[in-house]
Structures are given as structure tokens and as C-alpha cells.
Regions:
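Phosphate/nucleotide-binding beta-alpha loop and adjacent structural elements of enzyme active sites
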Residues: 1-227
Length: 227
């Protein structure tokens, strides 16, 4: 039996993150090596969320931001969801080598108005894994089926008061018309490229629900909302 070859490891925000140079695209490898990978999100979320916040992260990927969240709010106060099932082993390994046993599920979350829980949905994987999404593009290398869970149910079960999101434009479907009782902080990467009109509609809905933009914690496409 051949021994597993040790993967390259980089330091991001004080955590060891493994790089799979065979599976990750050159662009992803470079972003991880230079520290560019989710740099803004990692920096801001450490200030935006506080110890004791209950954070539900959507789009946990390989766990780099998840680790920062776990350190900030406490392991027991974090739960993560990622649609790409191929990233779960990577995230769990990153959690293991850093000694933070964070909870992580493979699923797509939808609010009740958009269909809620039940069934499976197509998820399109890109070698640049940070742009894998529910939308097929020419760079899609394969499509997998992923279970759908209800956002409101998961919020209630975990008693979350905070949402962290980076889901390549799907934030519109997740947040617009969502019942966000109990949520007082949202931090997301806002993707304008799919549709500015839909982004504006989502923001109008959230503002009407009592959220305001926290300008001190908002930078570039990283948007912080509080109420």
C-alpha cells in the first residue's frame, strides 16, 4: 500500500490550510499560496462577529473562513454548509489539523418561499472551486446532485443569530423573502455579475425587514448588515 503524499500547507489567518495541487486549479493554488484567498472575508468576519454569536455559514468551501469563525465565536457556536460535496474531505482535514472540530454539512439551503427542503438539485463544479455554483457555465467540469435543506429550519434548529454567506450569486434566492426572525447580523460576498436588479431587490427586502448596512464592516463586495 502506497503512503499518502503529504500535501503542501499554507498559513491563512494563523491556520494551516492544505493545498491539493492535483485537484485545485493553478489560479486557486496561487490564491492560497499568496494569502489572497478570501482575505477580506477572513479579516472582516473576525471583527464583525463576536464571542457567543451563533453563526450559520453558507458556502463553507475548504473551511478557511470557517476556522476563523470557529475561533471567534467558539466551535459550538458555528455550523457550516457547502454545496460542493468534493470539498467536504478538504474542510474536515483542515479542521482536524488545526484542532477545531467544526460541524459541516453538504447541502444547498433555500428559504421556504423558494422551495424549502426536500429533493435534490444540480450543482455545477468548476476547477476554480470558489466559482462552482448552481449555474452551469462553460468552465463547468462536472455536475453533481446535492440535497436541499430549508434555511429557516436550519436557523431554528441551530438557534443562529448570524449568517455568513459566499455562494456565487445564489444569495438572492436564499435571502429574498426569507423569514429571518432571530437573525441580527449578515455578512456576505455580494455578487453583482448575475443580476444587479436581483441584488437590489434582495437588499430592498432586507432593509424593509429592518437591516441596515454596517459601513465600518463593509468593503468592496463584502457586505455587512445589522439590525
Amino acid at each position: 500500500m502506497l503512503e499518502e503524499i503529504d500535501k503542501e500547507t499554507v498559513d491563512l489567518s494563523g491556520f494551516k490550510i492544505k493545498i491539493d495541487t492535483e485537484r485545485y486549479s493553478p489560479r486557486m493554488v496561487e490564491a492560497l499560496r499568496t494569502g489572497e484567498y478570501e482575505a477580506g472575508e477572513r479579516r472582516i468576519c473576525e471583527e464583525f462577529f463576536k464571542a457567543g454569536d451563533r453563526v450559520l455559514e453558507i458556502g463553507s468551501s475548504i473551511g478557511a473562513v470557517s476556522l476563523v469563525l470557529g475561533r471567534t465565536v467558539g466551535v459550538e457556536n458555528f455550523i457550516g454548509y457547502e454545496a460542493n460535496p468534493e470539498l467536504m474531505p478538504d474542510a474536515l482535514e483542515n479542521f482536524r489539523i488545526n484542532g477545531l472540530p467544526l460541524t459541516y454539512h453538504t447541502a444547498v439551503l433555500r428559504n421556504r418561499v423558494r422551495g424549502g427542503a426536500g429533493g435534490m438539485i444540480d450543482f455545477h463544479i468548476n476547477q476554480d472551486f470558489w466559482i462552482s455554483s448552481l449555474t452551469w457555465v462553460r468552465e463547468t467540469i462536472r455536475t453533481v446532485q446535492v440535497p436541499v435543506l430549508c434555511l429557516e429550519d436550519e436557523i431554528e434548529k441551530f438557534n443562529a443569530n448570524c449568517l455568513m454567506m459566499d455562494i456565487e450569486g445564489a444569495e438572492y434566492d436564499v435571502l429574498e423573502y426569507a423569514e429571518l426572525d432571530g437573525i441580527n447580523k449578515i455578512f456576505m460576498e455580494l455578487h453583482y455579475w448575475p443580476s444587479r436588479d436581483r441584488a437590489n431587490k434582495m437588499l430592498k427586502y432586507l432593509i424593509n425587514e429592518g437591516f441596515t448596512v454596517d459601513l465600518d464592516m463593509t468593503a468592496g463586495h463584502s457586505l455587512a448588515l445589522i439590525r
